[in-house]
């Protein structure tokens, strides 16, 4: 099964929040499916962007349209209730996103408590959109968490050694958004695979927004 580990749906029927003046163009479920049809994609993960904040409406609508082969990666405030977690889990959400690069999510000081709570309650992993140059200072904290992934190969060559150490310890790494990184992608993929053959998850990053 070809699974797209990272994509975005932008549905203007639901709230969008300008990020430093940026608002993405519409990219609905039909646009996404048409884009990936040549690739044979059969499932995927719809990831909330900074411009979607804590809105769940667009994500629930997208998952309902896409069907059970697709899951959601959402942003939630620390005040989220157990009932809300249960409801989102039943709808197909499977992960929590901390967007430390662009904002729109809960902040770093809530990472451990919220990530642990979501994992213990509904089995979710937590995903970090972060410049890998900032990983060293939170490396020990990340290794205390049960299930973590890092977006876009960590973005920066300077922090790649930390990404490799984390991969060795079981942290997953999303191989997507190659236009965002400042290093040779092929070499990084080889190094991450050598560190942990199960670490890499490949995604289209469609429609390649400033998410």
Model-flagged regions — what are they?
Residues 53-133, 169-180:
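Active-site gating/metal-coordination segments in enzymes
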Residues 144-146, 150-169:
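Histidine/lysine/aspartate-rich catalytic loop segments that bind and position anionic ligands
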């Amino acid at each position: 099964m070809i699974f797209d580990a990272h994509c975005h749906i932008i549905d203007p029927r639901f709230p969008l929040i300008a990020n430093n003046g940026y608002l993405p163009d519409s990219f609905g479920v039909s646009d996404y499916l048409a884009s990936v049809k040549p690739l044979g994609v059969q499932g995927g993960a719809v990831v909330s962007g900074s411009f979607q904040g804590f809105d769940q409406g667009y994500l629930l609508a997208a998952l309902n349209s896409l069907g059970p082969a697709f899951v959601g990666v959402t942003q939630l405030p620390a005040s989220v209730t157990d009932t809300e977690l249960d409801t989102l889990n039943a709808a197909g959400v499977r992960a929590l996103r901390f967007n430390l690069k662009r904002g729109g999510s809960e902040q770093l000081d809530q990472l451990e408590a919220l990530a642990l709570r979501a994992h213990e309650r509904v089995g979710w992993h937590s995903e970090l959109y972060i410049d890998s140059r900032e990983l060293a200072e939170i490396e020990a904290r990340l290794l205390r968490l049960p299930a973590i992934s890092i977006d876009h190969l960590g973005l920066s060559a300077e922090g790649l050694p930390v990404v490799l150490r984390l991969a060795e310890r079981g942290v997953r790494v999303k191989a997507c958004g190659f236009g965002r990184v400042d290093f040779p992608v092929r070499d990084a993929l080889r190094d991450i695979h050598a560190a942990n053959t199960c670490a890499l998850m490949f995604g289209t990053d469609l429609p390649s927004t400033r998410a």
